[in-house]
Structures are given as structure tokens and as C-alpha cells.
Amino acid sequence: SPNIAALPFSDLKDGVNYVGDTSVILLLHAPRKDFIYVQGDFNDWKLSNDYAMNLTPDRNTWWIQVNGLQKKSYAYIYNIDGQIKVADPMAELVLDPWNDAWVNRENFTDLPAYPTGKTNGIVSVFTVGKTAYPWKNSAFEIKNPSALNIYELHIRDFIASRDYETLIDTLNYIKSMGINAIELMPIGEFEGNNSWGYNPSFHMAVDKYYGNENQLKEFIDICHGEGIAVILDMVLNHAFGQSSHCRMYWDANNNRPSTDNPWLNPVAKHDFNVGYDYNHESSSTAKFVKQVLHHWLTEFQFDGFRFDLSKGFTQKNTLGNTGAWGQLDNSRIAIWKRIRDEIREYDKNAVLILEHFADNDEEKVLSKEGFLIWGNANHEYNEATMGYTSDLSWGSNYKSRGWNEPNLVSYMESHDEERLMYKNLQYGNSNGNYSVKDLNTGLKRVEMASNIFFTVPGPKMIWQFGELGYDYEIDYNGRTGEKPIKWDYLQDRNRAHLR
């Protein structure tokens, strides 16, 4: 039987809590478990009663204080009921024996060694005596969200070195286009290394593929010094199978989260789900989401989030009826208002962007509540650039939707949409000697579309290299596969003119 004991301090959070320079208190939310031990570098990975965790009187939270630590990194896991070994779901760094071998050590110079021979699987890491990053531009804030010009980028397909330090070197190029915000595709720990990042496993950790946490902080800090906000693409609709939230409560017979999983639905509530669907009406999930968002906004000083698949934050079951999924859902609105209110308790200026694509009556409510809403104008603008009839009003003009607030983040391209120039060159219209399939003509068509696009009031977003007429198909090398990095486009005078 576990020792029943109240938490020693009232302000402890799930995960690692540092107590001075030699101790940590570990907390794990794990209701309905019988016993949990901690194993790690600090006890040579031995299963010992000295490292049995205490259970709080409400029987929901397990905790232990580990003393006698030195100023260094320690790997550890939780051994649950003698059957499940998992990394801390709130870990800020994990070691992966299957994928870390392909992490470039020049990008992540201080990666701790995996405890080979002591354990197996993914392990979590904490570091005692870690030096705080010396922020220089903490006073930065977004002054006017409706004037955002956002540059969406995926580090893997933007720079060959795939690291934050080289990304810093591109800021003059990005800033020269009038960009005042960068939206990073997901950089939280995801499964594998080569990915868009929408397959998250540890939502509090920086994925090691692009560098360590201080390198990310330096990138954000320097962006702020240049007057550029940094927005994080946040994936909280779901988790993938390596997540400890999945593994702690798993139905092996049906290969899905168990019915008593505190965070995840056994079966997703909508047809567009990927991975395993979070139940955002669960108090466990709400607590988790609140801590994750606070971590990224305060520890890394991100300026806001673009929430992936925000329409999925509902327990309304619409499987088999995609149309019903998009209809006005007051329970979903309530979830988003709760998340917003929790953020506003400590950050009044964070920009909250929803990839929602719900019916207009719901998006109008959310816009009025201060959310920015993605507005996909790809089809309409691409029809125009190809030389066909098109109505440009709905995708990019908030007033056409009956909104009072300029909170529509419109875009002609995104990571999810086909590239304008690809379709211009493949399917462009013609009239006599005038053909949109001609490269320079196609570029001129995109230039004309841009002149219209950027004059419509409200925030705007462009996709990386779209300013140079990137013309590789979105499905080149597979939809989420690596794409050619085309800085050489700058050598083409007509492409360079477009930007």
C-alpha cells in the first residue's frame, strides 16, 4: 500500500519542481494506480522502497522528493504497478534510444547520454542548477494583432542545417518583406525526427532535432529585438502513441486509450482526428493544457499560439457527419473561452489563432471573443492567378463574413494548401500568346493577387518561399515529406522581384 501524504507545498506542479540546488519534488497525475516507483540516474535505476512515491489523500497525484543531487542532468522514469515504465508526461527533455542517434550534435551540443544497459524506452530528464537564459528583450509585445504580417515556416524545409542558430541568420531577409511575426510549425517533442510535427509525444519538451531550449530562446529573443513576434503552432487536439498519456492507460486488446484514461477519448469524436483524441471536458486534460500553455508563454516568451485542429476541442460526437462537426457548438466555444481566460490571467497580450473552419456563426462568436481565426483564401486567389473567375471576398475580408472585428488571418498559401505557382504552371489559363503557364507571366499573376490581398484590412499570413513563387507540388515526396529548399530562387530576377 502506498504512503498517503499531502503535498509538502501548495504551489507544486505536475512534473519536476526544483527545491534549492540539491533536491527535486516529482509529481505525477495518475489516478487509480496501485503503486509507483521512481527509477533513474540518482538511484542507479534500482527498484527501491526508498523511491516509492507518496499518494495524495484524494488518490490522484503521486509525489516524491529526491535529495542529495548534484548540479547536472538526471534521466528518470516512473515504474507504474510493476507493469508500465514511462517517461514523465510533463518532461521538458526526453531521451529516445531509437531516434536520438540521428539528432545532429552540432545542433544539440549538450544532449545527455542515454542510460544504455540500465533501462529501455524513452526516458525523461531534469537538470539541477540549470542556468537561466539571460533575456534581453522581455519587454516586447504585439501592439496591434490586426496588423500582423505572419511568415509561416517549417525549419526542416527552410534551411538545410535545420537549426535555430542558422534560422537567426535569415531574419534580415524575413524582416525586409515587412514581416512582423513568424509562426513556427510545431517544435514540441514529436515522434521520430523528420516530421511536420503534428504527431506530438511530449507537449512540454523542445524537439531535439532543431536544437536545445536555449537556442530556441535565443532565436525568440533576437526576433523580439528585431520587432518580430514568434507564434508557436500548438498541437493539443491529440497525442501519438509514444505519449505517456497513452501508455499509462492503454487498452491493448483494442489498441487504443482505455475507457478510464483521464485525458484521452478511447474513440475520437470527429472524423478528422489523427493520433489519439484529447477529451477537453476532462478536468485532467484542462489542467494539463493550462500548464503546457503557461510553460511555452512564460519559459520561452512566445507571443501566442496557432492552435492546430481547434474545431476538434469538443466532446460532441459527430463521427460519420463532417457537416455536423462544423455546426455551432456552444460547448466547444466554452472550452475555448476557458482556455483564453486562463491565459489572460498571466498574459494579456498573447495572440490566440484558431485553425477552426467551423460554420460562420461559431467563428463570428469566437472572433468577437478576441480569437484570431484562420481564413483560407487559397482556392479563390489561385483561381484568380490561373486566370479564371473568382470571388475574393469571403476568404480574406472579415466584413464579408459579418464580423465587426478584423480578426480573420487570411492567407493565399499555408503548409496545408497547394502552391499558387505550381497550379499556375500546370493549369494556368491562356489567351492567344498570353499564357499563365509561362513562368514570368505566372509570377506576375501572383504579384497582382498579392497587391489585392495585402490591401484588405486585417492580419495576413504567407507560407515560406511563397514570396519567391515556390512551385513544387505540395505532394512532392509525399505531402509531409521533405521539400527542396530553394534559396537559389533569389538568383532569378523575376522571382526576387515578387518579394
Question: What does each of the following model-derived ranges do?
Answer:
Residues 198-201, 475-487:
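Active-site His/acidic residue clusters
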Residues 94-103, 107-119, 131-148, 154-328, ...:
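Substrate-binding/active-site clefts of carbohydrate-active enzymes
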Residues 102, 301-303, 318, 323, ...:
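Conserved alpha/beta catalytic core and glycan-binding cleft of carbohydrate-active enzymes
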Residues 18-20, 27-71, 81-104:
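Aromatic-rich carbohydrate-binding modules that target alpha-glucans
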Residues 33, 71, 155-158, 189, ...:
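Short, solvent-exposed loop/turn segments at secondary-structure junctions
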Residues 78, 457, 485-499:
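Aromatic- and carboxylate-lined catalytic core of secreted/periplasmic carbohydrate-active enzymes
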Residues 73-75:
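Short, conserved beta-strand segments of beta-strand-rich sandwich/propeller modules, principally
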Residues 1-34, 112-115:
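Non-catalytic, glycine-rich low-complexity segments
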